Structures are given as C-alpha cells and as structure tokens.
Amino acid sequence: MPATVKKTGSKKSKRNVPNGVVHIQSTFNNTIVSITDTSGHVISWSSAGASGFKGARKGTPFAAQTAAEAAARRALDQGMRQIEVLVRGPGAGRETAIRALQVAGLEITLIRDVTPLPHNGCRRPKRRRV
C-alpha cells in the first residue's frame, strides 16, 4: 500500500487580478475590509479584530487603518492595481481605511457610499440613557 502524501500550505494559487472592489463595512464597534475581484469572489479580507485589536479599540480609526493595510498587502500580492471602494456604515474608520488603501499603492477609481437607508422599515431600538 503506497504511503499517502500529506499536502501542507495554502491551497490558494497566486492569481493575477488587476482590478477589484474593496468593501469597507465600518460600524461603531469594528471595521471589516473585504477585497474582491470584479465578479465578487473574495481575494483578501481583514478586520480590526483580526488585526489584533480587542474590545473598544476595534472601533478606532487606527484599527481600521491597520485592517485596510493588511487586506491591501494581500491584494497587491495577487497583482491588484486598480480598485473601486464601496463604503457601508457610520463608523469612525471609513476615511482612514480609504486613505490606508491609497498609501498602500492601490489606485482608487471610484468611492461610493452604499450605506443602507430604510424607507421607514423596522422600528428603531429605543434610545440609550447613560
């Protein structure tokens, strides 16, 4: 009986994807950056929590910058050069994440705010009294 060869390492091959879309979801508690190709397949992602921040520090602009840099680094390894940025949510890390993508060497062709706005849908949660 032949010995089975165990494969180690990443299964993802290095693809050459020149254009892509960056989805930045920025809430008050966290910032998630997903980089996809034009058809929507995720190439790289990162979040403030995945970058090593915990608790309230995940909602800071610096955590969003770190997450965007990490995702951009992996996208650049795949050969990405031009991106469109779709920003969702009201969080503190929106602008900082976009700036970090620019500094990382990605050329931004479009910035669009895709925050969902209800046309009077569900009832809002009651106001916090602190």
From Swiss-Prot:
Taxonomy, superkingdom: Bacteria
Under SUPFAM superfamilies, the record lists: Translational machinery components (SSF53137)
* GO terms for biological process, alphabetical: translation
The molecular function terms of the Gene Ontology recorded here are: rRNA binding; structural constituent of ribosome
Keyword annotations from UniProtKB, A to Z: Ribonucleoprotein, Ribosomal protein, RNA-binding, rRNA-binding
State the Pfam families in the record: Ribosomal_S11
InterPro entries (UniProt xref): Ribosomal_uS11 (IPR001971), Ribosomal_uS11_bac-type (IPR019981), Ribosomal_uS11_CS (IPR018102), Ribosomal_uS11_sf (IPR036967)
- Coiled coil ranges (UniProt) are none
* Keyword field contains rRNA-binding: yes
Gene Ontology CC terms: ribonucleoprotein complex; ribosome
**Database matches in Gene3D superfamilies:** Ribosomal protein S11
Q: What PROSITE patterns does the annotation carry?
A: RIBOSOMAL_S11
Purpose of the protein:
Located on the platform of the 30S subunit, it bridges several disparate RNA helices of the 16S rRNA. Forms part of the Shine-Dalgarno cleft in the 70S ribosome.
- Describe, as the record does, how this protein assembles with itself and its partners: Part of the 30S ribosomal subunit. Interacts with proteins S7 and S18. Binds to IF-3.
PANTHER family in the record: 40S RIBOSOMAL PROTEIN S14/30S RIBOSOMAL PROTEIN S11
Alphabetical list of NCBIfam families matching this protein: PRK05309.1, uS11_bact
Protein family (similarity comment): Belongs to the universal ribosomal protein uS11 family.
Return the protein name. Answer: Small ribosomal subunit protein uS11
Q: Tell me which species this is from.
A: Prochlorococcus marinus (strain MIT 9301)
Tell me the name of the encoding gene. Answer: rpsK
